[in-house]
Amino acid sequence: MDKMELRYNSGNILNEEVHKIGIIALGSFLENHGSALPIDTDAKIASYIGLNVSILTGAKFLGVVIPSTEYSYVKHGIHNSPNEVVEYIKIMIEHSKKIGINKFLIINCHGGNTLIKDLISELNDKKTSVILENVCFTHAAFEEIAIGYAVGILSEDKMKTHSFKTYPEIGMIGLTEARLKNTDIDNEAKILEEKGAIFLDKNYGKTLLKNLINNHVEIVKKMSEGDSNVGRLPITRL
């Protein structure tokens, strides 16, 4: 059988090297986010960013990781072990290698998944590059509300009841064990308590989403050019 020659230069792509880059979305599917955001908020935001970056660059969107993990003391959803998450990613990587992909950008939008950082670094070798980029904000608070609106998963009607006084997972204000065991969580919760009610800033959400997409486009561009010095630009927070 004659070898099929593919037109790697076709379409709207940065360059032919993007065909060696795969984008993986990582979030969580079963996690409470108050009343205005769905339980799979993190997975949907990560997928939205990843797919749009793929469209704008030509890199391949490989899909979303099903399992997710979390710190044992953060109790607001159903999660898996770090090893289960990484094993799933390994399967995605192995199948992707068969279609010529050897560079992987994982866009993670769930704080608990930062636990896999060291395990992910072990997947790198001379032939494979795996980069984990974390986009994590205070849980179900200002940033997630804003970006949720921009993505289209926020219920504006349910914002009326989206309060940390009712839903303890918002800002993790009511998650006592998590606040006692993690100073970062406690500090973010204190900031939210001081601000009081959560409000929706639609313009901020649109700007935040645009910046996140553009930032990851730049990361893919650097990856396609062989630049190992990639990283996320600082995001202005409310």
From Swiss-Prot:
Requires one Fe(2+) ion for activity. One of its GO terms (biological process) is riboflavin biosynthetic process. The keyword Transferase does not apply. It catalyses: 2-amino-5-formylamino-6-(5-phospho-D-ribosylamino)pyrimidin-4(3H)-one + H2O = 2,5-diamino-6-(1-D-ribosylamino)pyrimidin-4(3H)-one 5'-phosphate + formate + H(+). Its cofactor is Fe(2+); Zn(2+). Pathway: Cofactor biosynthesis; coenzyme F420 biosynthesis; Cofactor biosynthesis; riboflavin biosynthesis. Fe cation 1 binds at E31, D42, H110. It is an enzyme of class 3 (hydrolase). SUPFAM superfamilies: Creatininase. One of its GO terms (molecular function) is 2-amino-5-formylamino-6-(5-phosphoribosylamino)pyrimidin-4(3H)-one formate-lyase activity. Fe cation 2 binds at H33, D42. Its EC number is 3.5.1.102. InterPro entries: Creatininase-like_sf, Creatininase/forma_Hydrolase, FAPy_deformylase. Signal peptide: none annotated. Keywords: Hydrolase, Iron, Metal-binding, Zinc. Catalyzes the hydrolysis of the formamide of 2-amino-5-formylamino-6-ribosylamino-4(3H)-pyrimidinone 5'-monophosphate (FAPy) to form 2,5-diamino-6-ribosylamino-4(3H)-pyrimidinone 5'-phosphate (APy). Belongs to the creatininase superfamily. FAPy deformylase family. Homodimer. This is 2-amino-5-formylamino-6-ribosylaminopyrimidin-4(3H)-one 5'-monophosphate deformylase. It comes from Methanococcus vannielii (strain ATCC 35089 / DSM 1224 / JCM 13029 / OCM 148 / SB). The lineage of its organism: Archaea, Methanobacteriati, Methanobacteriota, Methanomada group, Methanococci.
